[in-house]
Amino acid sequence: LFPTNGVGFGHFTRMYGLARRLRRLDPDLEIIFFTTQPTLHLPYLDGFPTYHLAGPKKFQGMDSDAWNAMVQEMLTLVLETHRPKTFVFDGAFPYRGMLDALDTIAVPQKVWLRRAMFRKGSSIPVDSIGKFDLIVHPEDAVQLPLSEVDHGVEVLTVPPMTLIDTNEMWSREAARSRLGVPQSARVTYVQLGAGQINEIDSDV
């Protein structure tokens, strides 16, 4: 499983939830994480072997070509060591180093877990999409009109993917108590989004 860095932890949360459910279905299934996320300690503590490579911005003076070469070398070693039957990537854009590693080590099933559709005019090359055998689109709470490019890869739409199941959720009272919020208070959650990525200054 390869969750990437995003603005928040959406990629990681989906993959972590997927790993927990797969383990529940088959306790003997080997599930390996390879991630650029700093949250690697969470799956590691849960018993999932985890490999980490920091994102390119963490390396001073390193260009994208050098970083992608590191991705290719490390991921190739991981794939060669574990020989997975399925590779699942969760991210907005596939890294060139990742695609090169998948070209080096054959993986029977390659899946791209991507929340958003590939909209017309997208900067994602169609040949990158074609590297995968299956595209999985988790649904959002709000349905969006489809305007997906014709990429020729099988698509599967699934319900929203969450980290925990309904029976694992805290009650309203317990959640407020853990957060230190008065039971009778009106609570508003504000998510400003992607910061510099979405230029939110103009909206605040």
Region annotations inferred by a language model:
Residues 1, 33, 111-112, 137, ...:
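Structural beta-sheet core signal
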Residues 1-7, 21-77:
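Conserved nucleotide-sugar phosphate-binding/catalytic loop shared by glycosyltransferases and other
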Residues 11-23:
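Short amphipathic alpha-helix
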Residues 75-94:
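Short N-terminal targeting/anchoring amphipathic segment
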Residues 88-90, 111-115:
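Short beta-strand elements of ligand-binding domains
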Residues 115-116, 121, 128-198:
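A nucleotide-sugar donor-handling region in carbohydrate enzymes
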